[in-house]
From Swiss-Prot:
One of the primary rRNA binding proteins, it binds directly to 16S rRNA where it nucleates assembly of the body of the 30S subunit. It is found in: Plastid, Chloroplast. Residues 17-44 are annotated as: Disordered. The lineage of its organism: Eukaryota, Viridiplantae, Streptophyta, Embryophyta, Tracheophyta. Keywords: Chloroplast, Plastid, Ribonucleoprotein, Ribosomal protein, RNA-binding, rRNA-binding. This is Small ribosomal subunit protein uS4c. It holds the Pfam family S4. InterPro entries: Ribosomal_uS4 (IPR022801), Ribosomal_uS4_bac-type (IPR005709), Ribosomal_uS4_CS (IPR018079), Ribosomal_uS4_N (IPR001912), S4_RNA-bd (IPR002942), S4_RNA-bd_sf (IPR036986).
Amino acid sequence: MSRYRGPRFKKIRRLGALPGLTNKKPRNGSDLRNQSRSGKKSQYRIRLEEKQKLRFHYGLTERQLLKYVRIARKAKGSTGQVLLQLLEMRLDNILFRLGMASTIPAARQLVNHRHILVNGRIVDIPSYRCKPRDIITAKDEQKSRALIQISLDSSPHEELPNHLTLHPFQYKGLVNQIIDSKWVGLKINELLVVEYYSRQT
């Protein structure tokens, strides 16, 4: 299954706010109207929608998300918590959380077009897993810095999660530590996602 490239508002109307996909928000009451039209949701549909929320927010294909679930299952600790940590520490998501890109798809473009350095080297893989003490910077070119400046100027200036530090005038971000679960950038019940996949495999 490919990455979603369709109308974004249609998705947030059904699934709720997906800040990684778009900074638009569903109108108040639209979710309630959808629920009343569709009646009571089955447990399967509830798990499916939670999985879709995760997939669309982080901009993943079905195959990519399944791969992350399998990695999380093999790791120590809660599978759901590990899954969220893996997704939050992706380079495209870190750029988004720093405000250096307005959405995760925009961050992915920055990385694919070689505008981003990690520890002084160009990284063109959006799924690159960032680690504590990584230094993320814009390439020292006017175009790269201009693209990031647009995002920094238009970002909502929300409180940065405590695992990140931003130096906006240097176009630089620091990864201080692995993300704490309370700073995850999406309202999600990750256990429902794990349950969805445990019933599929």
